[in-house]
């Protein structure tokens, strides 16, 4: 049984930027209120005509170019998203068509903000088992479409974007260890409860979140799974070069870093400029740090995140 490693990274952000000051013109809030509670200063918003697959395509093309491979070498496409183009088919199938890769196995993973670590773990298993050789793994979201823009508790938090990696076969370990978890008992704390029935949308079509409860659970669960992932991989905390966390809340990120004994200058933070982009946030942050030279080949990196469900997980890798 072989290994897998990341061959290339890519990302895409819509050009439209929505600042806290602009939001304050719409709802009762302020830049100070948002920054003090979340760390967010701005977020990117997709154009009205764009779909999740459009953002995914741009990130995928960048990752393929970064990997230095021909797109025809890709034999698996996984898209992590909670804002698909449509109910079905999968956004991965739509992306496959846009990439011009007919016949390549393609499917979506839905674990909300933990979607990318779930998708990357799945792609790693496919490659290690011989079911794929080169996988395109994408996290893409247009969260702005599921927000109630009159609810200041949630509309200030999220943004749109996409990030991607190409994962390929390797003789040396790249993905060192992955650990996933979920607990459906907490589904009511973070959800979008709408469904289609009888030709109509039934239920509330906007994101709902019990912020304090989510914060409390996230701090505890992320610290525990990050520690367990290192222990099960046999890697000391001191050997960890970078933490690339889901970009949800600066205080949650700081808590996990403190638990791991990492200074914040070893944590990739894109939250202030991008907000919470759900499944896209981890690959977006990873690509930023790869492109600016912070994350380099041979370094030990942990990716971790939590989303509605709750579902959470961590991936430890050598970049």
UniProtKB/Swiss-Prot annotation:
Subcellular location, record wording: Cytoplasm
GO annotation (BP), single: fatty acid biosynthetic process
A GO MF label: beta-ketoacyl-acyl-carrier-protein synthase III activity
Gene3D superfamilies: 3.40.47.10
Catalytic activities: malonyl-[ACP] + acetyl-CoA + H(+) = 3-oxobutanoyl-[ACP] + CO2 + CoA
Positions of the UniProt region annotated as ACP-binding: 247-251
Keywords: Acyltransferase, Cytoplasm, Fatty acid biosynthesis, Fatty acid metabolism, Lipid biosynthesis, Lipid metabolism, Multifunctional enzyme, Transferase
Pfam families for the chain: ACP_syn_III, ACP_syn_III_C
InterPro entries: ACP_syn_III_C (IPR013747), ACP_syn_III_N (IPR013751), FabH (IPR004655), Thiolase-like (IPR016039)
Pathway: Lipid metabolism; fatty acid biosynthesis
NCBIfam families: fabH (TIGR00747), PRK09352.1 (NF006829)
PANTHER family registered for this protein in UniProt: 3-OXOACYL-[ACYL-CARRIER-PROTEIN] SYNTHASE, BETA-KETOACYL-[ACYL-CARRIER-PROTEIN] SYNTHASE III, CHLOROPLASTIC
Entry domain remark: The last Arg residue of the ACP-binding site is essential for the weak association between ACP/AcpP and FabH.
Its biological purpose: Catalyzes the condensation reaction of fatty acid synthesis by the addition to an acyl acceptor of two carbons from malonyl-ACP. Catalyzes the first condensation reaction which initiates fatty acid synthesis and may therefore play a role in governing the total rate of fatty acid production. Possesses both acetoacetyl-ACP synthase and acetyl transacylase activities. Its substrate specificity determines the biosynthesis of branched-chain and/or straight-chain of fatty acids.
UniProt cross-references to HAMAP family, sorted A to Z: FabH
Protein name: Beta-ketoacyl-[acyl-carrier-protein] synthase III
Originating species: Chromobacterium violaceum (strain ATCC 12472 / DSM 30191 / JCM 1249 / CCUG 213 / NBRC 12614 / NCIMB 9131 / NCTC 9757 / MK)
């Amino acid at each position: 049984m072989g290994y897998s490693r990341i061959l290339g990274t890519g990302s895409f952000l819509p050009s439209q930027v929505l600042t806290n000051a602009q939001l304050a013109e719409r709802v009762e809030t302020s830049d100070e209120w948002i920054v003090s509670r979340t760390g967010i200063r701005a977020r990117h918003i997709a154009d009205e005509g764009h779909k999740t697959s459009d953002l995914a395509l741009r990130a995928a093309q960048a990752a393929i170019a970064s990997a230095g491979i021909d797109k025809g070498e890709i034999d698996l496409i996984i898209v992590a998203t909670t804002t698909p183009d449509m109910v079905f088919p999968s956004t991965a199938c739509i992306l496959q068509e846009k990439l011009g890769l007919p016949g390549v196995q393609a499917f979506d993973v839905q674990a909300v903000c933990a979607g990318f670590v779930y998708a990357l773990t799945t792609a790693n298993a496919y490659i290690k088992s011989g079911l794929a050789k080169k996988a395109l793994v994408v996290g893409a979201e247009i969260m702005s479409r599921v927000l109630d823009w009159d609810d200041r508790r949630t509309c200030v938090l999220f943004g749109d974007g996409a990030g991607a990696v190409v994962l390929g076969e390797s003789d040396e370990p790249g993905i060192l260890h992955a650990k996933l978890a979920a607990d459906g008992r907490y589904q009511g704390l973070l959800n979008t409860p709408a469904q289609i029935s009888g030709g109509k949308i039934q239920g509330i079509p906007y994101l709902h979140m019990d912020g304090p409860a989510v914060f409390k659970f996230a701090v505890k669960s992320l610290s525990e799974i990050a520690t367990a992932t290192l222990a099960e991989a046999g890697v000391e905390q001191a050997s960890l070069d970078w933490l690339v966390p889901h970009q949800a809340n600066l205080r949650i990120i700081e808590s996990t870093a403190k638990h791991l004994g990492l200074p914040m200058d070893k944590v990739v933070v894109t939250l202030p400029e991008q907000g919470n982009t759900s499944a896209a946030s981890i690959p977006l942050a990873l690509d930023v740090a790869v492109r600016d030279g912070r994350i380099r080949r041979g370094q030990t990196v942990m990716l971790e995140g939590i989303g509605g469900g709750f579902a959470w997980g961590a991936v430890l890798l050598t970049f």
